[in-house]
Amino acid sequence: MDLSALRVEEVQNVINAMQKILECPICLELIKEPVSTKCDHIFCKFCMLKLLNQKKGPSQCPLCKNDITKRSLQESTRFSQLVEELLKIICAFQLDTGLEYANSYNFAKKENNSPEHLKDEVSIIQSMGYRNRAKRLLQSEPENPSLQETSLSVQLSNLGTVRTLRTKQRIQPQKKSVYIELGSDSSEDTVNKATYCSVGDQELLQITPQGTRDEISLDSAKKAACEFSETDVTNTEHHQPSNNDLNTTEKRATERHPEKYQGSSVSNLHVEPCGTNTHASSLQHENSSLLLTKDRMNVEKAEFCNKSKQPGLARSQHNRWAGSKETCNDRRTPSTEKKVDLNADPLCERKEWNKQKLPCSENPRDTEDVPWITLNSSIQKVNEWFSRSDELLGSDDSHDGGSESNAKVADVLDVLNEVDEYSGSSEKIDLLASDPHEALICKSERVHSKSVESNTEDKIFGKTYRRKASLPNLSHVTENLIIGAFVTEPQIIQERPLTNKLKRKRRATSGLHPEDFIKKADLAVQKTPEMINQGTNQMEQNGQVMNITNSGHENKTKGDSIQNEKNPNPIESLEKESAFKTKAEPISSSISNMELELNIHNSKAPKKNRLRRKSSTRHIHALELVVSRNLSPPNCTELQIDSCSSSEEIKKKKYNQMPVRHSRNLQLMEDKEPATGVKKSNKPNEQTSKRHDSDTFPELKLTNAPGSFTNCSNTSELKEFVNPSLPREEKEEKLETVKVSNNAEDPKDLMLSGERVLQTERSVESSSISLVPGTDYGTQESISLLEVSTLGKAKTEPNKCVSQCAAFENPKGLIHGCSKDTRNDTEGFKYPLGHEVNHSRETSIEMEESELDAQYLQNTFKVSKRQSFALFSNPGNPEEECATFSAHCRSLKKQSPKVTFEREQKEQNQGKNESNIKPVQTVNITAGFPVVCQKDKPVDYAKCSIKGGSRFCLSSQFRGNETGLITPNKHGLLQNPYHIPPLFPIKSFVKTKCKKNLLEENFEEHSMSPEREMGNENIPSTVSTISRNNIRENVFKEASSSNINEVGSSTNEVGSSINEVGSSDENIQAELGRNRGPKLNAMLRLGVLQPEVYKQSLPGSNCKHPEIKKQEYEEVVQTVNTDFSPCLISDNLEQPMGSSHASQVCSETPDDLLDDGEIKEDTSFAENDIKESSAVFSKSVQRGELSRSPSPFTHTHLAQGYRRGAKKLESSEENLSSEDEELPCFQHLLFGKVSNIPSQSTRHSTVATECLSKNTEENLLSLKNSLNDCSNQVILAKASQEHHLSEETKCSASLFSSQCSELEDLTANTNTQDPFLIGSSKQMRHQSESQGVGLSDKELVSDDEERGTGLEENNQEEQSMDSNLGEAASGCESETSVSEDCSGLSSQSDILTTQQRDTMQDNLIKLQQEMAELEAVLEQHGSQPSNSYPSIISDSSALEDLQNPEQSTSEKAVLTSQKSSEYPISQNPEGLSADKFEVSADSSTSKNKEPGVERSSPSKCPSLDDRWYMHSCSGSLQNRNYPSQEELIKVVDVEEQQLEESGPHDLTETSYLPRQDLEGTPYLESGISLFSDDPESDPSEDKAPESAHVGNIPSSTSALKVPQLKVAESAQSPAAAHTTNTAGYNAMEESVSREKPELTASTERVNKRMSMVVSGLTPEEFMLVYKFARKHHITLTNLITEETTHVVMKTDAEFVCERTLKYFLGIAGGKWVVSYFWVTQSIKERKMLNEHDFEVRGDVVNGRNHQGPKRARESQDRKIFRGLEICCYGPFTNMPTDQLEWMVQLCGASVVKELSSFTLGTGVHPIVVVQPDAWTEDNGFHAIGQMCEAPVVTREWVLDSVALYQCQELDTYLIPQIPHSHY
C-alpha cells in the first residue's frame, strides 16, 4: 500500500497481462494442470476434460474448432511452471503491496467488463464508510432480498458484490473484526486472520475497497479468474507466510480430500443454493453472517483452491489455505453430501426461502447443515487445526463430523464466534474457522450470489487441487455447481421433483468426490446436462420464479443455473458460472438496480450475465424445446462456444466473470458489438452455422449469440430479455412475476408449444417466408444457413423475412412469440425489454453502444452490406414474399386478427416486430402487436386490396426488400443491435420494423378507426412499403450514417434501447415518443416509415396530442387519425402506391410491377381517393386524391416516368448536383448550423446526395414517402410529388430540383438535421408535425412550446429533429434510399460506407457550391418575393430547369401534362413560376405565412412548395434543428425568401387552391382555408404565434379549428397544414419570422443542439445522463459554456440542490438549471419532459424555494449586476477567479482586474469581492478599501445574488475596512 498507486498499477497491469496470457480460455482462470492440444492451445486439464466429457465424440477446440480428443491432450509443464512463477510473483506482489492482487485483478477485469460500474464502485466502495453504508443498506434491506439486492444494487454499482455484500455486510460486524484484523496484514495472526479475514474479508475488504459490490463480483471473479491470483495474493500474502507447511498439508488435504473440498464446495454450493436464495431471501441475518463468513471461507477456500489450482503459489498459499480449507473441506465433505442432500432439501426450502425471507429456519438448517456442518466442522477443524495447523487433513474428519453435526444458526453463530475466537486465537484456526465460515459464507453468499461461482472457485480449487484432485474436485465441483446451480435454480424454481432429482444428482454429485468426479466426469457432466436440462426446465421456471421472487438473486441463481445449463461442462460451467455468478450476481443486483444495472450493463458483465441469465432462463425454455433438440448440444455448444469464445473469454478472462459470462458474454457480447464478433467467432462450433447465418443475417448472429438455437432462442430471449433484463428483469420479474409464474411452468410448454407454434408459424412463415428468404434475402444461403443452423433459425429465417428478429425472436418466439402463451410473458419480457431495455438499456447500453456502436455498426454495416446486397435480389421476389408474407399475414390475420395475428405476426414479426414489439410493445402492446399484426396486415391489406396485391407485392417486395434489407440490416444491424450495436441496427431494423410497425401500429390504431379498415390495408402495405423503403433507406442511411446516427441515434436509441434502437425512426419515435409518447413514436416511426402516415397522424396526432400522444395516441391518433387517418391512409395508400411503385421502381421493381403497382396504385389511388374521399379526411384524402386523382395517371406516368426519372435521377443525382446544388446551400447553412454535425451532415449530405441520387428516384418515393412522410408534405408530396412525379417524370430535374429543392431543403434540413433525407423525412415529419402546426413554427414554436409545454413535442421535434436528424435522415434517406432502390440501398449501404461516402462528400462539395449558387439565386429571388420563390420555384421548376434543365424539360413536360390534369394551378405554379410569383406577389400574408405558406405551399405547390416547403422547412427545420447560424441565416433567408417567396407561396396557395379545387372541396377548403387562413394567416398569425408557441396545439388547434379536414389535412395533408399551418403556420411561421428572434432563440434553443452539464451526480447518475443525452442528441460537456443550455443538478425530491459552481454559472447564464429527476423521469417516460417541472427551486443555502434559476432564466434581459463594476480580488476557494468573474459578467457586471482599474464616474458602482477565509493573512483584505473607493464585500454577496438572481444589499456582506495605518 506504500507503493505509489501508479507503480502498483503498472505492476498489476503487467501481472494482469501475464495472467491473461496464462489464463485458460475456457475458465479464464490461471491454467491449472495445463494441457496442450494438437493445435497447440493450452487449457486447464480440468476444463478440457469437462469439455470433452460434455458430449460424446470428439470435441472442438474452443479456439480453433479443431477436433480434440482426450488422447490428444498433452501435459504442458512449461506452462505449469509459468503459472507457478506467476503465482509466486502475484504472491510477492501481494505481500509487497499489501494488496490482494486477485481482487484488484478481478476488479480490473470486472471493471473492464463493467468499467463504469466497477470504477464507480471502486471509487465509491473503496471507503469503509461506503461499505458500511452498503452494509447498513444491506442490513436494512436484508428482509427483502430483492429489495436488498435492488437497493444494494442501486447503491452498489457492482451488483455482483451486492449479494455478498448483503450477506457479508450482515456478517460484517464479525467481518469488521476481520477487517480490523485485515488491517494488520503483516502479523501472522492478522495474516492468518487476515488470511481468513483477509482472504475472506480482504477479498471482501479489498473487494469492498474496490467496491463492496465488487466484493461478490470480485470474489466471484476472483474465484473465477483472479481468484487464484487475488486469493493467491491474499492467501499468499496472508497465508503463505504463515503456513507454508499448511499449504503442503492443504495440498495434501486437498489431494486427500478433494471430495471433501468438493464436498465443501458442494456444500458451499448447496449452501450456496440455499444460501443464495437464503441470502437473497436474507438467510437469517445470523445465517447470512455465518453464510457470509462461510462464503468468505469458501472464497478463501476457493481462493486457496484456486491457488491450489495454481501451482506454486497456489500450493504454498493453498497449503495453508488448503489445510484450513481442507479442514473446512473435510468438515464440509460430509456436509457436502449432507449439504447436497440438505441443499436438495434446502434448495427446495430455499426456494421457499427465496419466497420466504426468513427461510433460514429451514434453510439455515440445511444451509446450516451445509455451512453448519462446515461451521461445526470448521470449528472442530479450527480446534484441530488450532492444535495441528499442518495436519489439517485430520481435521477434515472432524469437519466431517462437524459438518455432519448440523448446527443451528446459534451454532453457526457460535461457530462464527468460535471462528472469530479462533481467528483471534490462531491465524490458522481463524483461517480455517473463518475460512470455512467465511469461505462457506462467502461461498454461500457467493454461492447465493454465485453458487456456481463459489463452486467455480471450488472447481478452481478443484482445478488447483486437480494436480492432486483438482480435476475431480473441479469436475465434482463443477457438477455440483452445475447441479447446485440447477438445484438452486430448480429449488428456487419450485420444481421440487426436479429439485429432488437435482438433489439426487446432487447427492450423486456429492457422492461424486473429486476422485470420483474424474472417473465420473462423464456421469457428472451427463448428470450436469440432465441437471442442466432439469435445471434448465427448472431454471427456466426457476429463472422466472427467481425473477419473480428475487429478481436479482434468483436471476443470479438462474444465471448460474442457466450458465450451468448452458455450460454443461463442469469447468466451463463452473468457471462460467463463477464468472456468470460474478456477473449474475451483479446482474441480479443490476436487475434490482436498473440504473446501476444499466451501468453494470454498460459494464457488460452484469448485462451479459443478465442476458445470459434471462437467456438462460429463456435459454432453458429454448433449451427445453431445443433442449430436446439442442439442450445438451447447446450446452456442449455453449461450452464449445465458451471454448470457441475462449479467445474472447481470454479477452474476457480479464474479467473472471468472463468464464460464465463467456457464454453469456458470447451472447451478450454478441449482443454487444465487440464481443459479438469475437464471441460469435468463438461460438462458431454451434454457431458456425449460426454465424454464417449471422454473417448473412446478423439476427442469426443474435441467435448465434445464444450459442445454440436453443441458446439462440434463449439468447434471443435472453438478449431480448437481457437488454431489458436489467430493467426488464425488474419489470419483467414483476411482469413475469405473474407471467413468469405462469410462464415459469409454461415456458417449456410455451417453449414447446411456442416452438411448435413457431414451427407452425415458421412453417407458415417458412411457407409464407420460404419465398421470403429468397425474396427477403438475396442471400438465400443465409436462410439455408439459418435453416441449417437450427430449425428455429430456419423457421426464423423465413420469419426473418417476415421478421428476422422473429428468427431471432422466434427462438424468442419459441419462448416469446412462439409461445403465444408466452407472448404474455414475451410481452412482459418485451415490454420490459422494450420499455426497460429501451429505458434501462438506453441508459446503460447507450454508453456501451456508443462504444460498441461504432464497431458494431461497422460489423453491421459489413453484414448489412452483404445483406443489403442480398436484399438487392429481393425485388424480384417481392410478390412472392408479398404473397408469402401476405399469406402468412393473412393466415396470421385470419387467426385472431389482432391477438392471433398479433401473436403470429408477433412471432413472425417477432423478429422484426418483436424487436419492434418490444419497443413497440413497450410503447404499445396493442400497438406493438398491432404493429406486428399491421406489419403483416399491411401486407395483408395490401394483398387484400388490388393495389394492395400489386402494391403488396411491391409493398411486400419493399417489405421483403425492406424486410430483407431491414431484416438483414435489421439482423445485420439488429442482430448486433440486439446485441449492443444491434440496438442501432435494431434501430434501423426496429426503426424499420418499429416504424413499419408503428406506422402499421398507428395504422392499426388508426385502423381501429375507420381509416384503419380503409387505410390499414393501404397504410400497412404502404407502411410496409414505405416502412420497408424507409427501413431500406433507414438501413441504407443507417448503414451510411449508421455510425453517426448510430452513435447519435443508437446512443439515443440505446437510451430507448429497443425502441429507439428499435428503429432509427423508432429512435425518433422513441425520442419523439419518449418525448411525445410511444404513439407519437409510432407516428414518428410512421413518419419515418411513412412520414405521411406518421405525419398525417403525427401532425394531427402530434399537433393534437404530442404529449397526449403517448397516452392518447390511440385515441388521439384514432381521432386525429380518424381525422387524418384517411390522409394517412390515402397518403399511405397513395404513398404505397406511388411510393411503393416509385420505391419499387427505385428499388429495381420491374416495370410491370411498377405498372401493376401503378395501375393498382392508380386503382388504389382511385380506391384511396374513394376511400379517402369517403373518409372524413377528405381534405387529406381529397388532396391525396387530387394528388392521387391525377396521381393515378401521374403515378402511372410518374411511376413509369418516375421509374425512368427516378433511375435517371439516380444516375443524374449521383452525378447531378442539381439537388446537390440546393443541398450545398442548405448544407452551408447546415454546415453553419450543423457545424457540430458536419461529419454527419457531410456524410449525410453525401449520403443525402447519394441518397438524393437514390432520392431523386426515390425522392419521388422518398419525397412521396418523405413528403408523404410529411403527411402534408405527403399530400403535398403527392400533389407535389405527383407534381414532382409528373414534373419529375416531365422533368427529372423537376423532381430532382423540386425534389432537389425539397431535397435541398431536405438536404439542408438533412444537413442541418442529417442528410437532407433527414431533413426531408424529418422536415417532412416536422413539416407534417409542423404542418399540423407549421413546420418551422411548429418545430420552432412547437419545439419552443413543447419545450415550454412539456418538451415533449419540443423534444420530440427536437429529438425528432435530432432523432429525426439521424433518424429522419435515416428514415427519409433510408426511405429515399430504400424507395429508390432496395438494392440500391443494399449496395448503397455498402457503397454508403465506401463509395457513397466519397460520392456524398463530392456531392457535398457540389451541393455546397450549388447551395452557394442556390443562395445566390435565392438572394436574387430573395430581393423579389416572386423571385425568391422562383428561386425556390427554381428549386422546384426553375431549379428543376436550372438544375435539371434536361430533366426539367422532360419532367416539366410530364409535369405540365400531368400537372395540368393533376394540378392545373399547381402545375402552373410549378410549371409557371410566374403564377407562383404572381401568387407570391398576391399574398404577402404568405410572407408571414411563409413558413406556413412554404409549408402550405408545399402542400399547394407540391414540387415547388415541397421544395420550398422542404426548403423553408429546411430553413425552419434547420432553424429549428440548428438554430445556429444556419437557422438564423436560413430563417432569415427563408423568411426573406419566405417573405419574398410568400407571394409564390401564396401563389402556391392560389395554385394550391385550384389544385384543391381539382382535388376537391377539402382541398379548396384547405386551400381556401389556406387562403382564408392566408388572409387569416394574419389573424392566424396572431394566433400563429400562439400556434407557434403552442406549436402542436396550433396544428391541433388549427387542425381542430380548421378542424377535421384541416386537422386531418394539417396533420395529414399539407393543405390542412396549409390552412391550419398556413393560418397557423403561416401565422406561426410569420410569427416565427416575426418572432424570429424568439423563434431563432427558441429555434436556436430548440434547434440548437442542447448542451448539458451535470453537477453533483455520481458516476452512475452521470452515465444515465450521458445515455439520456446521447439518446436525445444532447451535447454533454464537463464544463459549462455559453453554448450550455441545461445544468443538471443533483437535487432532493423538492428540487433543492447544493450550490456548485455550475449551479451559479447556470443561473447567471440563464440556463435551465434542472434536477437530475428530469433525466430519470424523461428516461422513464421515454421522452424529454418539460424542464419547467424539474427546474431547481432552491438550494440548501439560500432557501428551498427561492426560484432563482427560473427568475434568472426569465430575466435575462434584466441583469442583476448591470451598472456594477466588480473586481474579484484575492484568492478564492472552490472556484477559479475567472469563473467568478465570468459569473458576474453573465449577471451584467463589468469585470475589473485590478483595484486601480475601476472606472470613476457616474452610473458605475465599483464593488470589490473578496473571500476572507481564503486569505492567508488575516488583515490583508481589510485594507483593500484603502486602495480604492469601493465597498468590499464577501464572495457570498455574489453567490447569494446569483443564486437568488436578485442583487442583494451590500450591507450584510460588507467587510469592515481597517484604517490604512493599521494595514
From Swiss-Prot:
Gene3D superfamilies: BRCT domain, Zinc/RING finger domain, C3HC4 (zinc finger). It is an enzyme of class 2 (transferase). Its EC number is 2.3.2.27. Residues 1397-1424 are annotated as: Interaction with PALB2. Pfam families: BRCT, BRCT_assoc, zf-C3HC4. GO terms for biological process: chordate embryonic development; double-strand break repair via homologous recombination; fatty acid biosynthetic process; mitotic G2 DNA damage checkpoint signaling; negative regulation of centriole replication; negative regulation of fatty acid biosynthetic process; positive regulation of DNA repair; positive regulation of DNA-templated transcription. Phosphorylated in response to IR, UV, and various stimuli that cause checkpoint activation, probably by ATM or ATR. Phosphorylation at Ser-988 by CHEK2 regulates mitotic spindle assembly. Phosphorylation by AURKA regulates centrosomal microtubule nucleation. Autoubiquitinated, undergoes 'Lys-6'-linked polyubiquitination. 'Lys-6'-linked polyubiquitination does not promote degradation. SUPFAM superfamilies: BRCT domain, RING/U-box. Residues 705-716, 1373-1395, 1444-1470, 1610-1624 have a biased composition (Polar residues). A zinc finger (RING-type) spans 24-65. Residues 1642-1736, 1756-1855 form the BRCT domain. The modification N-acetylmethionine is found at residue 1. Residues 248-260, 327-338, 727-737, 900-909 have a biased composition (Basic and acidic residues). The modification Phosphoserine is found at residues 114, 395, 398, 423, 434, 551, 694, 708, 725, 753, 840, 988, 1009, 1143, 1189, 1191, 1211, 1217-1218, 1280, 1328, 1336, 1342, 1387, 1423, 1457, 1524, 1542. It catalyses: S-ubiquitinyl-[E2 ubiquitin-conjugating enzyme]-L-cysteine + [acceptor protein]-L-lysine = [E2 ubiquitin-conjugating enzyme]-L-cysteine + N(6)-ubiquitinyl-[acceptor protein]-L-lysine. Disulfide bonds: none annotated. One of its GO terms (molecular function) is zinc ion binding. There is a cross-link at residues 109, 301, 339, 443, 459, 519, 583, 654, 734, 739, 918, 987, 1079 (Glycyl lysine isopeptide (Lys-Gly) (interchain with G-Cter in SUMO2)). The modification Phosphothreonine is found at residue 1394. It is found in: Nucleus; Chromosome; Cytoplasm. One of its GO terms (cellular component) is chromosome. Keywords: Acetylation, Activator, Cell cycle, Chromosome, Cytoplasm, DNA damage, DNA recombination, DNA repair, DNA-binding, Fatty acid biosynthesis, Fatty acid metabolism, Isopeptide bond, Lipid biosynthesis, Lipid metabolism, Metal-binding, Nucleus, Phosphoprotein, Repeat, Transcription, Transcription regulation, Transferase, Tumor suppressor, Ubl conjugation, Ubl conjugation pathway, Zinc, Zinc-finger. Residues 230-267, 306-338, 650-739, 896-915, 1181-1216, 1322-1395, 1440-1505, 1565-1642 are annotated as: Disordered. E3 ubiquitin-protein ligase that specifically mediates the formation of 'Lys-6'-linked polyubiquitin chains and plays a central role in DNA repair by facilitating cellular responses to DNA damage. It is unclear whether it also mediates the formation of other types of polyubiquitin chains. The BRCA1-BARD1 heterodimer coordinates a diverse range of cellular pathways such as DNA damage repair, ubiquitination and transcriptional regulation to maintain genomic stability. Regulates centrosomal microtubule nucleation. The BRCT domains recognize and bind phosphorylated pSXXF motif on proteins. The interaction with the phosphorylated pSXXF motif of ABRAXAS1, recruits BRCA1 at DNA damage sites. The RING-type zinc finger domain interacts with BAP1. This is Breast cancer type 1 susceptibility protein homolog.
